[in-house]
Amino acid sequence: MRAVVDTNVFISGLMLPHSTPGKVIAAWREGHYQLILSEPMLSEIGAVLNYPKIRKRLAWNDLTISRSLTLLRFEAEITDIQGTQAHVPRDSKDNMVLATLLASEADCLVTGDLDLLTLAELHPICTPTEFLLRIF
């Protein structure tokens, strides 16, 4: 299975490894699915990892963040979303996430974002709990 994992799930999973988002990240690390990201999503993950509150919670420094982003570049499938039209009516900042799903033709977008979840009737979008039920 190929899945786009939204930034909110990814960061939550790093911060709370025993939570449902943490289990989504663990399932990727264990090879249960292929993680799909795009360059804009990688940039967003990097920006969020650099928030002082997140850095403190994870106890990560610049080197740890840099290494983690490099690992993501090599381990995730990076999809080019240029030219992909995506529109999230309630939050245009989510357009890049939906564009990643559409451009990659992934099996699922895993998110906790209500603006994206409202589009689940039109696209393969699910919550972390629903995703875990699908892969296990």
Question: Where in this protein do the model-derived segments appear?
Answer:
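Acidic, PIN/NYN-like endoribonuclease modules and their adjacent C-terminal/linker elements
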Residues: L102-V110, L114-F136
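Active-site neighborhoods of divalent-metal-dependent phosphate/nucleic-acid chemistry enzymes
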Residues: R73-C108
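Alpha-helix N-cap/helix-start capping motif
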Residues: N8, E39, D62, D113-L114, ...
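PIN-domain endoribonuclease scaffold, especially VapC-family toxins
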Residues: A27-T84
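Residues at secondary-structure transition points
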Residues: S19, I36, W60-L63, V88, ...
